[in-house]
Amino acid sequence: MTETNTQKPKNRAVLVGLWAYRLEREENATEESMEELSDLLKTAGGECVGTVLQQKDAPDPRTFIGEGKVAEVRELVRAMDADMVIFDNSLSPSQQRVLGEELKVQVLDRSALILDIFAQRARTREGRLQVELAQYKYLLPRLLGMWKHLERQEGAIGTRGPGETQLESDRRHIHRKIAKLESELKEVRRVRATQRERRIKNEVPVVAIVGYTNAGKS
């Protein structure tokens, strides 16, 4: 008997952008930047299933886009069976957390998407370390969003137990990981500098192949 795989494809994303008068020009989302975001999503292996671009006077400090647009995005997520929402603009950790709670799916911004692409394409040890370090630094202030199901308990009398302990444990773990990665990066760069000095001292020629992407340099 032939089995049919009915599981939906992963990384179906609704893309959201805001153009606001009170944002700097480079901070605003435009039709062109939204198209670029869609291309980035494809590069990362995802699929754009809908876009929402809002224009308003200023970002909402809580949800970045207006409450009405949040409801519109929520309905679009449901209608298109999306499993994530990606913002073209940068979100604060608190905005990302609130939006995740409101939309009931993973919420990312352009920075997180680009870091994911870098992680996929990093080939050298130094490159992989740099991307991992950037990802941990991006994650650290957003940890509370991952533990939002414990947020009601945090700080309450009689609840300073497993939930808050785990959150602090994760923070300490990431701080240690960041310190370790920074140390490893420093060592990699030291070794590379030493090797470069040795090549120069020994007059070893350096050869570089130059050409366009996909021009057959490999």
PLM features per residue range, with description:
Residues 112-134:
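Short alpha-helix plus adjacent loop in nuclease-associated cores
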Residues 37, 85, 136, 174, ...:
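Residue-level signature of catalytic and energy-coupling elements of molecular machines
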Residues 1-110, 114-116:
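N-terminal accessory targeting/assembly segments
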Residues 133, 137-151:
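A charged, well-structured terminal subsegment
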